[in-house]
Structure formats: structure tokens, C-alpha cells
Amino acid sequence: MIVNYFFLLIILLISIVSPLSGNSISGSILASKYSSSINDFQKSADFNLKILESGIDDPAFYNDALLYLVASGNFNASFKLSKKMFDLDIRSPALGLVMIIEKISKEKINESISLVNLFEKDLPPVLVASIRGWMNLKKGKLEDSLYEFKKLSDTDLNFDLGAYYSAIAYSKFSKNEEALKIINKNNDNFKLLGKNFEILKSEIMIMNGESFKVLETLKKSISDFLNDITLKELYHKI
């Protein structure tokens, strides 16, 4: 399950950096406000795509459509749209991120790194360091990965993303004691991630041979999260 956290954390990063790109959403967001207010991002994406199909070739509408496709989870459509945007010489943080995610999903690590370098000026530093860190981790370069993640701990983010990523990095190299040291030090801060953090912590404790201790931890977590089914299933598997 730990390997799946990369994409969850990329979405987390989108939510962190999107307020930093206030001009990335055009006036079309007003016309599709109702759709997005009920979390129907696909309708908002379709709205912008229809505008483009009508002959309007404004980069802002391309960017809006791309953002809404990502928000709706329609990554295949977002990958297709990103190729068209790139060919039209449209550049934006959202485009760079989508193209990078596509290469990552296809395990094309070197191409992913090349895209990070290409879009570095368009992307927030926190995102660049995050992706480079994960790419180094994917290539088996733990120290290089930790170096990039350390940059995240030196930012003004309220959540220590660098420490969280570092804990996951250590666990992927079976250095579970190091991972738990970070988790225990930042436990209160990491709890902001809710049950996803509790699951991660439990899995690392299990890998570190602390099955009895993790049962006690999960009991409390199950109580805190009102008998969450996922946590209960994990508890009964131990």
C-alpha cells in the first residue's frame, strides 16, 4: 500500500500549490460554479472542452479543462489534452505536472526527470523537490532522495511534507526504525492526514516486528475514527 501513497501525495501537493497559481483559472470557473460546487468536476471539464470545440482557442480554457479533468480523476483524458496543449506551445504548472505524472505512471523515470527540468521555472519549488525526491527513490538513490525531501522541511508549509516523505523513503529501503523515529517525532503533525497516516504508521510498525504494539495503536485509531472499516480490516489481518 505504501507505493500507492505517491499518487495520493501528488494530489495533496496539487491542493497545496493551487492557491499559489491564482491566475490559472479563467472566468469560465464562474459559469461552471454550480458543477464544481457539487464536486462534479467532469461537467466543468466538459463545459470548457465544448468552448474549445466551438473554435475559441484561449489557453486559459485549455488550462481550466485540464485542471478539472485531473480533479475528476479522469487522468487518461487529461493526458490526451496535455499532449495537444504541449503541441500548441501552451505552458502552465498544471500542464507540466500532468505530463510528469503520465511519464511516472508508465515507469519512464528518465523522461519524467527531463520534464521536471523543462518545467522547473513553471512549477513551485516544493513540487520540483518532491518529484525529484521520488524519482531518485525510484532509481534506488535514497540519499539523493532524502536531500530533496529535506528542502521541503525548510519551507513555510504548515505540514512537514519533507519529514513525511522521508519516513516513507526509509521504509521502502527497509530502514523501518529510522522511519518510525521520524513518525514518532512528528506524530501530532502527521495526524493531519487522518487515517491514511494511521495506516502508513501501522504498516511500518508491522514491518519492524511490532505487531503487538500496533494492535494497541490501531485500537485507539479505530476509536478516534469512529470504527473506520479500513482500519478495522487492518486490525483483524494482524
Name these PLM-found stretches:
Residues M1-V3:
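N-terminal secretory signal peptides that target proteins for export/translocation
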Residues Y5-I16:
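Bacterial N-terminal signal peptides
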Residues P19-A65, A71-K80, I90-R91:
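N-terminal leader/linker segments that initiate helical-solenoid repeat arrays
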Residues G22-S28, G55-Y62, L88-L97, K121-I131, ...:
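Generic helix N-cap/helix-start motif at coil->alpha-helix transitions
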Residues A45-L49, F75-D87, I109-K121, L142-D154, ...:
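Alpha-helical repeat scaffolds
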Residues R91-I100, I104-Y164, A169-K172:
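Internal alpha-solenoid helical repeat scaffolds
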